[in-house]
Amino acid sequence: MAVPKKRTSMSKKRIHKNIWKRKGWRAALKAFALAKSLSTGNSKSFFVRQLNNQTLE
């Protein structure tokens, strides 16, 4: 198993963590934008079948 030779500095550790956090933030932003476009009906990449608004009795 590979073992690092030296300890990772705090600044490098912080940089790696921020990159990891930014990837998650971007994915969440993209998912939110897609959900928003689907809910407003402005989506160009998904075809959503529209259901008739019927009251259940």
Swiss-Prot record:
It comes from Vitis vinifera. The keyword Plastid applies. This is Large ribosomal subunit protein bL32c. The lineage of its organism: Eukaryota, Viridiplantae, Streptophyta, Embryophyta, Tracheophyta. HAMAP family: Ribosomal_bL32. It is found in: Plastid, Chloroplast. GO terms for biological process: translation. Its main location: plastid. One of its GO terms (cellular component) is large ribosomal subunit. One of its GO terms (molecular function) is structural constituent of ribosome. Keywords: Chloroplast, Plastid, Ribonucleoprotein, Ribosomal protein. Belongs to the bacterial ribosomal protein bL32 family.
